[in-house]
């Protein structure tokens, strides 16, 4: 992405919700590289899909020659952002937050280049400037510049202030000051002139712009990316099992890949613009080809491949594709022990069983059948496979060779109903 028209390019991709003084920002970008930042609060032990758009935006700016600062909120994570939250957040312990800070910093690192000369990325932590700040300094040097009248009129906290059952504590109310000071601090330390974030961060970003102007007399800017929505109105980034995480231990690469494969046709081309680095021309060409092919669209596979590679690397992508192919074909010979571990984690339903069980019992325990009687009929009708091999004997007992890697047996009823037995 060429820097001079970067904002226009982001707008073409649908990646800009709001921007302060767009003309002045475009002018500033045209003058040469800038430093910009995005903050990530450690509110869990992993980032999730909702963090991916702003994180990839940092990467887009770096590719255009700008210097990204990834700020992990070691201090703000101890407080909790009330923006558009219906209730007060639970406060986490310092040890927990510190542990999460380390994990999130490691997660952010692969997306940015920390060794590319002038525009190498920087990892920062706001605990560095808040950790030893005393309350009087905070109130005199920061609080003095904030008008409570303006703060209570910010959309992000308005709804909480108007609810009788859920007010807002002074702790969460002060979050706005902390994030505002982050911007002023990064402006002074690294010359940061732009903050990017989700659209729910607009109120916090504009506070930082005002504070930076008051403290350092510098003009700085804010840009928010939109909240990702799905065409059917359901929430993006959630599955029946909850959030889709970037940590492979919380959402396996296979499950992650499948999430993207299942994208609706109405969303897929928009998501290619949000989550990949394909050019608009390439995406439009793909859409045209899909429309004219008369076959199932290729776009979902392209999207799944691109995003899985971005988040889990080539190895994670190949494992996800291998598992997908083996489940589709029914032949399991290509699967490694690690592949089976992904399936056990969240890929297919899983049941633990003691050795010595028979097939009928396994079908009932795995909920592939409601009763032994029904299981008997289904086995006899040749509708059950064990590790891809048909089994039609209702009296069948599992043998040692059925336990792949000594641990796993994959049952299938019909074409699509799987359950993985993990032997105790």
Swiss-Prot record:
Motif ('HIGH' region): 42-51
A GO MF term: tyrosine-tRNA ligase activity
InterPro entries named in the record: aa-tRNA-synth_I_CS, aa-tRNA-synth_Ic, Rossmann-like_a/b/a_fold, S4_RNA-bd, S4_RNA-bd_sf, SYY-like_C, Tyr-tRNA-ligase, Tyr-tRNA-ligase_bac-type
The keyword Magnesium belongs to this UniProt entry's keyword annotation: no
Record domain S4 RNA-binding: where: 357-414
GO BP annotation list: tyrosyl-tRNA aminoacylation
Enzyme category, top tier: ligase
The entry's keywords: Acetylation, Aminoacyl-tRNA synthetase, ATP-binding, Cytoplasm, Ligase, Nucleotide-binding, Protein biosynthesis, RNA-binding
Binding locations of L-tyrosine: 37, 175, 179
Catalyzed chemical reaction(s): tRNA(Tyr) + L-tyrosine + ATP = L-tyrosyl-tRNA(Tyr) + AMP + diphosphate + H(+)
Cellular component terms per the entry's GO annotation: cytosol
Annotated protein name in UniProt: Tyrosine--tRNA ligase
Source species: Escherichia coli O8 (strain IAI1)
Lineage: Bacteria, Pseudomonadati, Pseudomonadota, Gammaproteobacteria, Enterobacterales
